[in-house]
C-alpha cells in the first residue's frame, strides 16, 4: 500500500528493509502467487519459496452467519451474481457501490431477472440502504460459508477498482467451480484460468451479459 500512496512513499524503502530483514529469518515462505514469489526473490530472500496451489486458501466461514442455504434457496428462476468480501474494507465497499450504479443498473434493464447478492462481514449502513432501495440487490451480510453460493450462482464478480495483492476470495471462487468476471485489480497475481474473465471496467457489464446469454 505504501508504494501506491504519495504521502507514504518516502517511508516505503524503510518498510521494505524491515520486511527483508524479517524474511531472512525464515527458512521457508508459502506465497499466494508467482507474482509474490518474484517479489520475494527481488528482495534477495534465499530460503525456499513455494506457491500455494489453487484451492488451499479459504476465507469467509462465519459460525454465526446466515446459513448459506437460505441464500441459495432464493436463486430459483433468477440469474444470480455473487460478490463476496469483507465489506468494511474500503476497496470492497466502494467497488461494489460503483458496480451497482454503473454496471448492475444498466444490465438489469436488459435482463430484469438478474439479481446481485453481496455476501460478507460488516456491510456499511450506506450499502444496506442501497440494498433496501434498489430492487434485485441483496445485501446478505455474513454467511456460514460462501462456497455453495459460488457453486450455484450463474457468475461471481470481482469488480475491484483499487487495492493490492492476490484476492484469496477469487481463488476460492475458482476452486468452487465458479465462472468469475474480474477487473485487472480483482485478478491481480492470479494465474490464467479458463473460468476467469479479466476485463476493463468499461466492458464489465457487456461481459456479464455475454456470459449469461
Protein language model regions, located:
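Acidic donor-binding loop of glycosyltransferase active sites
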Residues: 27, 151-165, 176-179
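Conserved catalytic-core segment of nucleotide-activated headgroup transferases in glycan assembly
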Residues: 42, 52-135, 139-151
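Short acidic/histidine- and often glycine-rich active-site loop of Leloir-type glycosyltransferases
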Residues: 184-198
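Alpha-helix capping/helix-boundary segments
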Residues: 35-39, 123-124, 186-187
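C-terminal "capping" alpha-helix adjacent to the active site of nucleotide-linked donor transferases
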Residues: 194-213
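Acceptor-binding helix/loop patch of EC 2.4 sugar-transfer enzymes
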Residues: 1-17, 76, 185
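Donor nucleotide-sugar binding/catalytic pocket of nucleotide-sugar-dependent glycosyltransferases
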Residues: 8-16, 20, 24-71
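Short hydrophobic beta-strand element within catalytic cores of glycosyltransferases
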Residues: 169-172, 179-183
Amino acid at each position: 500500500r505504501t508504494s501506491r500512496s504519495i504521502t507514504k512513499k518516502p517511508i516505503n524503502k524503510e518498510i521494505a528493509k524491515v520486511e527483508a530483514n524479517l524474511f531472512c529469518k525464515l527458512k521457508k515462505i508459502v506465497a499466494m502467487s508467482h507474482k509474490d514469489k518474484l517479489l520475494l526473490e527481488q528482495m534477495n530472500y534465499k530460503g525456499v519459496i513455494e506457491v500455494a496451489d489453487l484451492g488451499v486458501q479459504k476465507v469467509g466461514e462465519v459460525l454465526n452467519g446466515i446459513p448459506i442455504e437460505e441464500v441459495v434457496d432464493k436463486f430459483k428462476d433468477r440469474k444470480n451474481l455473487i460478490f463476496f468480501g469483507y465489506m468494511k474494507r474500503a476497496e470492497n465497499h466502494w467497488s461494489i457501490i460503483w458496480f451497482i450504479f454503473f454496471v448492475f443498473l444498466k444490465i438489469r434493464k436488459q435482463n430484469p431477472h438478474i439479481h446481485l447478492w453481496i455476501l460478507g462481514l460488516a456491510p456499511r449502513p450506506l450499502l444496506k440502504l442501497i440494498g433496501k432501495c434498489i430492487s434485485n440487490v441483496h445485501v446478505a451480510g455474513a454467511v456460514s460459508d460462501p462456497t455453495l453460493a459460488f457453486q450455484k450462482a450463474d457468475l461471481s464478480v470481482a469488480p475491484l477498482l483499487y487495492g493490492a495483492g492476490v484476492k484469496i476470495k477469487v481463488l476460492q471462487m475458482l476452486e468452487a467451480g465458479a465462472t468469475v468476471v474480474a477487473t485487472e485489480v480483482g485478478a491481480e497475481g492470479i494465474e490464467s484460468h479458463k473460468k476467469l474473465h479479466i476485463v476493463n471496467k468499461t466492458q464489465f457489464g457487456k461481459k456479464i451479459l455475454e456470459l449469461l446469454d
